[in-house]
Amino acid sequence: MKQTIIAVICFLCVSSLYIQAQKINHPSLLYTPQRIQQVKQRMQHEPKLQEAWGDIKKTADEALQKKDFNRLDYLSLVYLMTDNKEYADAIKEILLKAVEAESWGDVEMMARIPAWRSQLGMAHKSFLSAVGYDAAYNVMSSSERKKIAEGLKRLAVEPALGDWLLEPTRIHSLNSMGHNWWTSCVCQGGILALSLQNELPEVKEWVEQLHESLPEWFDFAGDVLQQKAKSFDEAGGMYESLNYANFGIQEALLFRIAWINTHPGQNPGDIPQLAKLPSYFSQVCYPRTGMLHSLNLGDSHKNVSAESSMMLLYALGVKDPTILWYIAQVEQGQHRDGFFLNRPMGFLYTPDLSKAPAVPQLPTSQLFADFGWATMRNSWEKDATMLAVKSGHTWNHSHADANSFIVFHKGVDIIKDGGNCWYPNPAYRNYFFQSQAHNVVLFNGEGQPREQQYSGSTLRGYLHHLLDAGNVKYVLANGTGPVSNNFSRNFRHFLWMDNVIYMIDDLKTHKIGQFEWLWHTNGTYKKSGVDVNVTNGNSSVVIRPLYPRLLAKSDFVHDYPEDLYWEKIEAPTEDLKGTETYYSFHLPAEVNRVKGLTAIILKETPNEKDLPQMERREGQDWIGLRIRHKGKVTDLYINQLADGRLMHSNSWIMPDGWMTDAYMFAVSYPEGTEAADAKDFFICHGSALRRDKETYFSSLSKLFVIQKEEDKKLNLWIDGQPKINASFRSKKKPIRVEVNNKRIPVVYKQSQLSIKLVD
């Protein structure tokens, strides 16, 4: 009997210890004792943190007087930093009053069928409530904790997790709402559930279900029937625009950190996409003097940054130096929702930036093929030049901008995106979302069908074959699908050589009509003969249309009836406080097939006079340019037979003594020498380049190639096929060969270098 009693007592003790182990030791979600201690230590020798603390304390003191629910995060942080019970009592009072509400639902959302009981406003309230409850937990009585917990479950936890995750009440799927709303609603509801589980053991199972489901959000592969995009690109990043990508990722990471903090010693599992996010956020940013800018493709603004996600990644153990570099570029307060030093999360989670590198160790170009973005830059230094191209999905936050582009130069988006505004405003659906707000080609005044905002584009756009050889870069945009109601070909090539971006449009439509090129510029626009100069401070570019026609030389366009004429179009500014002008270059002729070639000359200074000289040249089945600048000559050829007009015959042309089937190629050589002796080539979609019975390049399948030879070293950049057997002419055996920045063995025979590649 005695042994039985002892056994029962031991069992009860073990059970009690197990139950205690399952309980959360508040505070432990995000404002942890460890974080508080670390920031106190850093404040002793970091004046910026001291200044930020003063701002936070001031905000908290104002909230203390007003009993401001929306400043629960400030009150919580100040209480945990000072241990002044006055702040904790205010938190308790605010929460006790908050749970008296009948509902935190939104009237418009509740009117939907089925009713949406939760939305972003509720998600934010959930976060604030969780932080406050976690901070003030130990000053509440057990009855107060229970009352608040039950109220918050009714108002937020059950509606959020019930709508987005739990059976049998779930109404959303990843296919219908699997973007930033999903992580915000379910993860903030999950953080709140984490904070309440001591009083409400039943929510623990909900939390664990969310934890198990979160990787599924990152892995969502899209679908065919509803044309939903794959959420995360293989190279990192999310298609929704930087603004919403950062927001959705941030919300997910907040929950993951809170889960880890409340589950010490437990393995959270791997989410492989996280490791690629620092590169993504950096590749779509533009470092400059002043605040960091980022791509504003879709529903984002150029001042939006992703320091919040970067900080949370760093806290999760992704100790990539790129994160430190990125955060160091962000200007305090540069956008509405940031994690800045004088805001609680930024105060606690901004890492020590003293070891941030001057520039990131990243490639200067990046292709995000899954969602159709590409960036190319000449340097990671501030105020460099960056070209960004978009041709991917259209739907929701992703605009009708297939084949559009942005040019940042000398600190300014000198060729810009039209922007966006608040969605209920008619200007959003009538202008900002539509093709007219982007740098694209219209046919008979039409771009992508307007209904794609809601229905999406069944046929998406694509980007292909990015090559980066330093002073020569290339990417191909295929925007045919989104405009296939009018176009059978809508290809746009971007060939960046030295200080000129050449934009080549290959266009064919189902019927005869008129083409126009749209230009959204950010600066003083001045037409000078056949050129347009755009200048903003130290940033200046020349826009020079070369094919199909030059820009009419003067305002007397009737004297140049075949040349491009221009139209000024007024459109709303992003802030909706006024209007701005964008420009359309019209081709007067009515045709159904055209090649467009426009040079964007990147000026070193607004007053630079030594610009490239460009001579238009044509021959049998080809058009092109001869470019002379600073002692170098570049011949650019565009093959008129290689645009799909031939079915089974190959597209051979013979320009200036060359023989090739390439869609386009360029050869560069010092002025005063012969093209035949050139060592630098660009070949676009070609299988051979020959001259005087010599083979300069050969491949059984057509490839995209940049070739540079210098100091007995041959560098090649090649794309186009998974298996490649190619040969390249070199007069002498090179001592070193690199292909796509990787050294390979030198296999050389009779002036031919053999290259074998397998993906």
PLM region descriptions:
Residues 118, 122, 182, 245-248, ...:
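Active-site-proximal structural scaffolding
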Residues 19-21, 421-759:
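CBM-like, beta-strand-rich accessory domains located in the C-terminal region of large
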Residues 415-420:
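Catalytic Cys-His active-site segments of thiol-dependent hydrolases/isopeptidases
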Residues 164, 178, 182, 352-353, ...:
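Flexible, surface-exposed loop/gating regions in the mature catalytic domains
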Residues 1-22:
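Bacterial Sec-dependent N-terminal signal peptides
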Residues 172, 196, 239, 243-414, ...:
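Carbohydrate-active enzyme catalytic cores, enriched for enzymes
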Residues 26-44, 48-279:
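Aromatic-lined, polymer-binding surfaces characteristic
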